[in-house]
């Protein structure tokens, strides 16, 4: 019985394998015959050539290729393909039209007057085929074969020869529509737009030709001297319209001239820099007026209440011998003179106006601002011109200027103009030395004044970090994000002493910020373990809470008021109390932290972003993955100041800036900076800082004072509390919970067909290992990890 059962199983296996093997054999056979037919090998090859030429005529290769496609389908899919789908039907229609056109051409050549009777078409085709059988393949012209003869005979009988051409054209159009799966309007709309734009261009060229012809006829009647004066007058006419609307002449910012030449220019630049430094994102807060009090009574009362406050976290006192680094440590910028820049700008302005004119937009270029990497053209449209119409011409303007990409700012804030930003042919480097050496940096009392770069007008862009109060930096890899972070850190090291500003650096990538280890400004060594990072952020939150308790006991509202209170106390008492330093927390890669402990990190960042400003704690968060699961809505809502470097898509730009624009940046330090309170971002060329300059600054600072880390702020080693689970379904259950992003006992019972006890044990094990949250009544348990974390673990 066992042998009979085994034989039956083998026979059944043969029956199941036989159909698939049959299709493979048929497919390979057809493929081999097709190759033999193409090469016309032997009697078989020539016979198949005659067979296909009978039906397809001179286009017999189409039939052979169709058989090859059928054989490949047999081998791959092991079954009959659908030969009547929409795309194949379109292909059939086009082939029939080609065969009919070929047959019409054949019979026009064979007959003198081009007219043929209906019956003679098929008969003549058959006679030609028999004649070819006697002479051999390719000896007689067969036109479109029997298929073409049938199509031509039918159409000629019904619609005459011209009607046959019309029917063939209609078949081709229907075939294209079937293949592309579009209707006629969708196919013809781009053609109409192209024709309309070409007509407008031709109309503009015709007008230019007429004007040029008139000018040439006038110039022939004058001497060479008058011709030169005429050209000079024309050049002045080109420049004059750019000065009609604006009071000032066109501005071409020469940002390479860092130092003023005379006293008048010094005063003018100083006024401009003061206007820049008092912009909304670095606006100085007026001092808090405190009520006058008697120094004998109220300070004693507050000191008595302060005795019950928590102890101060920072005990290091001021180092009198510490000297701030000099700007001589940083390199001077290499001034690179760009030749023919004015001529290029005027030529681009003319191209812009001509392009606007060709599209029927009345607009004039009135001012030009040349920046380090981008030149901004201010375009004033006439009354009645929609701004959206100018914005829609961005691709056409880029084509006219032969630019890589352009960015349109519509409108420019505070002006009735549209800004068109065009990349320069030569990019000028901006160094941190020239930014920190500008007039805007003459505020030694501002310890958190950071240098970012130069804007399009060539002015240095600096910002007060304590007014931001937090900063989000995002951009793709290689766009200049790490250089910007280094510039911010070095700006702080150049202005603040260790007792004035403290730094906490979190670098999960372990390569960007390790160079700063040993700097006396650090609270702790650079944190590189993502698991320790959440603990470090929690310690900063605890420090913030302790500071608020100190403020409450001393009757002050913020760190500035508290430090003023301490200064007044130290002037009257022998027991000196240290002032509270600012704390700057720098996270170089937020995405890695969100993968390991998203909930803890997000909660800590949310609390610091909401409350830490008055306590003197400021966040700088950088990430190269600007997605919504990294830059969450909670983080964005509490960090209003943002810097966006070049990103790959408009979606990433909207995640960072709540609007487009970053996808059009050039990279290599080109950024969009949107400070707190600003309506639109400012385009800035970021300051470059080499690794050698960073190392020199770090060596100088370490040489002035050794690091004194705060033991209470150093995160401890995080023990892995996960326990091994003996249940073999545990890994599958975790995978299911992570994929579904929901967890419940009933779901595990249904999916794995287990009892309540076993499913409950699995849920308890997941809660113990930090996969799901605690029990919340009728609500489903919260899943604490995502799919990316599960794969990484």
Curated annotation (Swiss-Prot):
Entry's Gene Ontology cellular component terms: plasma membrane
Pfam family, one: FtsK_SpoIIIE
Keyword flag Transmembrane: yes
Residues covered by the FtsK domain: 458-654
Chief place where the protein resides: membrane
InterPro entries according to UniProt: AAA+_ATPase, FtsK/SpoIIIE/SftA, FtsK_alpha, FtsK_dom, Ftsk_gamma, P-loop_NTPase, WH-like_DNA-bd_sf, WH_DNA-bd_sf
Subcellular location: Cell membrane
Positions of ATP binding: 478-483
TM regions (residue ranges): 25-45, 56-76, 88-108, 136-156, 157-177
Residue ranges with Basic and acidic residues bias: 212-221
Molecular function GO terms recorded: ATP binding; ATP hydrolysis activity; DNA binding; DNA translocase activity
Domain notes: Consists of an N-terminal domain, which is sufficient for the localization to the septal ring and is required for cell division, followed by a linker domain, and a C-terminal domain, which forms the translocation motor involved in chromosome segregation. The C-terminal domain can be further subdivided into alpha, beta and gamma subdomains. The alpha and beta subdomains form the DNA pump, and the gamma subdomain is a regulatory subdomain.
Free-text function comment from the UniProt entry: Essential cell division protein that coordinates cell division and chromosome segregation. The N-terminus is involved in assembly of the cell-division machinery. The C-terminus functions as a DNA motor that moves dsDNA in an ATP-dependent manner towards the dif recombination site, which is located within the replication terminus region. Required for activation of the Xer recombinase, allowing activation of chromosome unlinking by recombination.
Homology family: Belongs to the FtsK/SpoIIIE/SftA family.
Name this polypeptide is given: DNA translocase FtsK
Lineage: Bacteria, Bacillati, Bacillota, Bacilli, Bacillales
Record gene name: ftsK
């Amino acid at each position: 019985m066992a042998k009979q059962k085994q034989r039956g199983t083998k026979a059944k296996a043969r029956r199941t394998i036989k159909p698939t093997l049959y299709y493979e054999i048929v497919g390979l056979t057809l493929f081999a015959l097709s190759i033999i037919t193409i090469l016309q090998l032997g009697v078989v090859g020539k016979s198949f050539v005659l067979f296909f030429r009978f039906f397809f005529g001179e286009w017999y290769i189409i039939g052979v290729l169709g058989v090859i496609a059928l054989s490949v389908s047999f081998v791959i899919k092991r079954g009959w393909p659908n030969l009547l789908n929409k795309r194949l039907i379109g292909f059939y229609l086009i082939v029939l039209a080609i065969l009919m056109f070929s047959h019409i051409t054949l019979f026009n050549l064979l007959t003198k007057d081009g007219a043929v009777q209906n019956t003679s078409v098929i008969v003549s085709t058959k006679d030609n085929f028999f004649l070819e059988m006697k002479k051999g393949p390719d000896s007689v012209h067969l036109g479109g074969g029997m298929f073409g003869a049938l199509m031509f005979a039918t159409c000629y009988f019904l619609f005459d020869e011209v009607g046959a051409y019309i029917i063939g054209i209609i078949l081709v159009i229907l075939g294209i529509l079937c293949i592309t799966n579009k209707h006629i309007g969708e196919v013809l709309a781009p053609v109409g737009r192209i024709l309309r734009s070409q007509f407008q261009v031709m109309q503009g060229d015709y007008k230019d030709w007429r004007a040029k012809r008139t000018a040439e006829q006038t110039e022939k009647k004058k001497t060479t001297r008058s011709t030169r004066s005429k050209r000079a007058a024309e050049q002045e006419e080109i420049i004059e319209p750019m000065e009609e609307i604006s009071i000032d002449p066109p501005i071409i910012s020469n940002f390479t001239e860092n130092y003023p030449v005379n006293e008048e220019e010094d005063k003018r630049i100083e006024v401009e820099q003061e206007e820049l430094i008092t912009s909304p994102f670095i606006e100085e807060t007026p001092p808090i007026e405190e009520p006058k009090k008697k120094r004998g009574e109220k300070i004693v009362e507050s000191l008595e209440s302060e005795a019950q406050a928590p102890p101060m976290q920072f005990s290091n006192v001021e180092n009198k011998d510490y000297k701030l680094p000099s700007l001589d440590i940083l390199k001077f910028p290499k001034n690179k003179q760009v030749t023919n820049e004015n001529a290029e700008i005027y030529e681009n302005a003319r191209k812009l106006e001509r392009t606007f004119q060709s599209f029927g937009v009345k607009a004039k270029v009135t001012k030009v601002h040349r920046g380090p990497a981008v030149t901004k053209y201010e375009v004033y449209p006439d009354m009645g011109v929609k701004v959206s119409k100018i914005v829609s011409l961005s691709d056409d303007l880029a084509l006219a200027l032969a630019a890589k990409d352009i960015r349109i700012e519509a409108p420019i804030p505070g002006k009735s103009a549209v800004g068109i930003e065009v990349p320069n042919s030569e990019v000028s480097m901006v160094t941190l030395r020239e930014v920190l050496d500008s007039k805007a940096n003459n505020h030694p009392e501002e310890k958190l004044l950071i240098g970012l770069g130069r804007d399009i007008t060539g002015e240095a862009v600096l910002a007060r970090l304590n007014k931001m109060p937090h900063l989000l930096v995002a951009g793709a890899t290689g766009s200049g994000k790490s250089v910007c972070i280094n510039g911010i850190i070095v700006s702080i090291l150049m202005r603040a002493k260790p007792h004035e500003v403290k730094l906490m650096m979190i670098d999960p990538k372990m390569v960007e910020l390790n160079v700063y280890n040993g700097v006396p400004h650090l609270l702790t060594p650079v944190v590189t373990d993502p698991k320790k990072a959440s603990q470090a952020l929690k310690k900063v939150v605890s420090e913030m809470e302790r500071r608020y308790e100190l403020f409450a006991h001393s009757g002050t509202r913020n760190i500035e008021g508290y430090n003023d209170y301490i200064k007044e106390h130290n002037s009257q008492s022998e027991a000196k109390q240290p002032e509270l330093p600012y704390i700057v927390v720098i996270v170089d890669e937020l995405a890695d932290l969100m993968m390991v402990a998203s909930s803890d990190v997000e909660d800590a960042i949310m609390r610091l972003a909401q409350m830490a400003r008055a306590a003197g704690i400021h966040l700088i968060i950088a990430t190269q993955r600007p997605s919504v699961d990294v830059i969450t809505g909670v983080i964005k809502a509490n960090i209003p100041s943002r810097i966006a470097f070049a990103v790959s898509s408009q979606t990433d730009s909207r995640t960072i800036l709540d609007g487009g624009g970053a996808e059009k940046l050039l990279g290599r330090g080109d950024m969009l900076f949107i400070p707190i309170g600003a309506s639109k971002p400012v385009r800035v060329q970021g300051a470059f800082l080499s690794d050698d300059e960073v190392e020199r600054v770090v060596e100088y600072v370490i040489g002035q004072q050794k690091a004194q880390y705060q033991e209470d702020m150093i995160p401890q080693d995080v023990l892995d509390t996960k326990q091994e689970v003996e249940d073999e379904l545990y890994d599958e259950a975790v995978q299911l919970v992570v994929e579904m992003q929901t967890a419940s006992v009933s779901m595990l019972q249904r999916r794995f067909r287990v009892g309540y006890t076993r499913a409950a044990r699995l849920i308890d094990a997941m809660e113990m290992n930090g996969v799901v949250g605690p029990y919340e009544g009728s609500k489903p348990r919260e899943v604490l990890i995502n799919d990316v974390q599960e794969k990484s673990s």
